[in-house]
Amino acid sequence: YRVIAVDQRGHGDTDWADDGDYSLDSMQADMDGVIEGLGLDDFNLMGHSMGGRNSFIWASRHPKTLRSLTIVDTGPETQRQGQDRIRNFRELPNNLDSFQEFADRIKEYTGRTEEQVLGALKYSIRQTSDGKWSWKWDPATKSRGRTADPKWPVEKLWECVQAVDCPSLVLRGDRSDIFSEETLAKMGKVMVDCTTETISNAGHLVQGDNPVDFITAARGILSRVNR
């Protein structure tokens, strides 16, 4: 498969928003621009967490465009416990003296091995001009997670998943405190041609916690729709 991995605004290597706008509407506009700019049509869309929500909203806005949609550990509703845990983690000091300090923090947060952490962390942090290390994401994105986007209430998000018209796969980590079993089951009932699956030995960061089973599940839907 040809894979295009997009960093959304304020994340990864994509620029920070000059106006601090990290609303769902702004991210939908970014997705429109990327997909149109690359000339994508009849393709498979996959997103995790924030990216998963952005993906199912985009899919609902563009019927008869996708070959498949994969949503990873998110839905129209998320659990307060997990939201608070992530928010508290993101509120920790964002300017550390060494790469290893970041690695130790991530190991404590995720329970992953040193090898797993070091393999992913190098893409997520950067060294600043003063020699310290910080996350690549814009600190302004922290405010996005504190309150729901008023233009996108839960009821509207449920309407979005019900409007998705392509085959879909919804994955949940069995230890996730963000995405509940009840929401997973409901999505499986209300979405058209939807398969749901729980990935064992995984929290919210499904693809990093159990990459083997995640890839197996992802390849399953890709194989089915790309024959």
Protein language model features and the residues they cover:
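Catalytic active-site module of serine/aspartate enzymes centered on a nucleophile-bearing elbow/loop
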Residues: 192-227
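Active-site loop/oxyanion-hole signature of alpha/beta-hydrolase fold enzymes
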Residues: 4-47, 216
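Conserved catalytic-core motifs of eukaryotic protein kinase domains, centered on the activation segment
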Residues: 14-20, 80-83, 181-182
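Conserved serine/cysteine hydrolase catalytic core
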Residues: 128-190, 195-198
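Structural signature of beta-strand start/N-cap positions in the alpha/beta core
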Residues: 2, 39-44, 65-68, 167-169, ...
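Conserved hydrolase catalytic core segment
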Residues: 38-80
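Alpha/beta-hydrolase active-site loop signature
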Residues: 8-12, 76, 203-206
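Helix-rich cap/lid subdomain of alpha/beta-hydrolase
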Residues: 74-137
